[in-house]
Regions:
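Acyl-group handling in specialized metabolite and lipid biosynthesis
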Residues: 206-218
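Glycine-rich, highly charged phosphate/nucleotide-binding loops
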Residues: 64-74
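Short amphipathic alpha-helix with an adjacent loop that forms part of the alpha/beta core around
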Residues: 72-82, 101
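An anion-binding loop in the catalytic cleft
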Residues: 2, 217-316
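Donor/substrate-binding cores of folate-linked one-carbon enzymes
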Residues: 7, 28, 85-204, 211
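N-terminal beta-loop-helix "entrance" segment that forms/cooperates
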Residues: 41-59
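A residue-level signal for conserved active-site and pocket-lining positions in enzyme catalytic cores
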Residues: 14, 35, 58, 86, ...
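N-terminal Rossmann-like dinucleotide-binding module
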Residues: 2-46
Length: 316
């Protein structure tokens, strides 16, 4: 049976670190004939053109990589590989209908939530932002609707209070890999798991844009604490301090306050506290403009921390 599965021609589509363990398991189990990923991006202050984690993984294994700017215009190259199955995990573009109907074993997506909850582009971030205590992975057959296809398998996982987008993404990636490894041989043998989603229970997420990353101190401290976790390690939440943008990496919820939201109400040895809707947000780790990320305690070694007291953040 394993020999037959090793002959299964797979096209894998994915982009971020989340997708890498899934690709690596497919390389071991099947014949990955092509990897499709997003085009290389300029990274850092020097704007160095950098491949996605998935592309880097595929190249290291000697597997051909295809990085179309517009998949809907270039999909025929993929179909020319004659895949038996297409598997996607956080790829980043809509897969056209012509691809969905081609493979004998269908198109399967590894999605970072318990569908139908959190369909769309940011399921992992959304679960943290909303303060959820549980989330999971869903394997589903793809169709034209966004994350609307029938469910093959799903598994739940706890969200730790300290989880960030980075740590939870890593846990879900391993869970997705293990679920796919367990399920793929059964799909290959022809068993059918089709469980329709209940559209009445569906919730939707959107791609997080640059303008969405600023902390809004009119919200509760708990909401902002979860927001910081959800955007760490990328793209990172930010604040404006006397016209300078600082990234915020680590926070906790402080004491209740009636001060104006956005006001720095306390400056401590290793943190500073900002008034929110109900209580303070204690900011403990930052990345000031033009500097590396650091604990606030270390930042204060070369900064007049008393000058922060009373500053109203996010004022242009």
């Amino acid at each position: 049976m394993s020999k037959q599965l090793k002959d299964l021609k797979v096209v894998f589509m994915g982009t971020p670190e989340f997708s890498v363990p899934i690709l690596e398991s497919l390389i071991e189990l099947t014949d990955v004939v092509l990897v499709v990923s997003q085009p290389d991006k300029e990274v850092g202050r020097k704007r160095v053109l950098t491949p996605s984690p998935v592309k880097a993984c595929a190249v290291s294994h000697g597997i051909e990589v295809f990085t179309p700017k517009k998949l809907r215009e270039e999909y025929e190259y993929i179909l020319n590989k004659k895949p038996d199955i297409i598997i996607t995990a956080a790829y980043g573009q809509i897969v056209p209908k012509q691809m969905l109907i081609y493979p004998d074993y269908g198109c399967i997506n590894v999605h970072g939530s318990l569908l139908p909850k959190y369909r769309g582009a940011s399921p992992i971030q959304s679960a943290i932002m909303n303060g959820d205590e549980k989330t999971g992975i869903t394997l589903m057959y793809m169709e034209e609707g966004l994350d609307t296809g029938n469910i093959i398998h799903a598994k739940e996982i706890d969200i730790a209070p300290t989880d960030t987008y980075g740590t939870l993404s890593e846990k879900l990636s391993i869970l997705g890999r293990d679920l796919l490894v367990k399920t793929l041989p059964v799909i290959f043998e022809g068993e059918n798991f089709d469980i329709p989603q209940n559209d009445d229970e569906a919730t939707h997420t959107v791609k997080i844009k640059r303008e969405d990353e600023r902390l809004d101190f009119n919200k509760t401290a708990k909401e902002l604490h979860n927001f910081v976790r959800a955007l760490n390690p990328t793209p990172l939440a930010n604040i404006l301090v006397n016209g300078e943008e600082w990234k915020v990496l680590e926070t906790e919820v402080g004491e209740s306050t009636t001060d104006k939201p956005g006001t720095v109400v306390a400056v401590n040895k290793d943190s500073f506290e900002v008034a929110c809707k109900d209580s303070t947000l204690v900011i403990k780790r930052i990345k000031p403009a033009g500097k590396k990320e650091m604990n606030v305690k270390d930042f204060f070694n070369g900064f007049n921390k008393d000058s922060l007291k009373g500053v109203i953040l996010n004022e242009e």
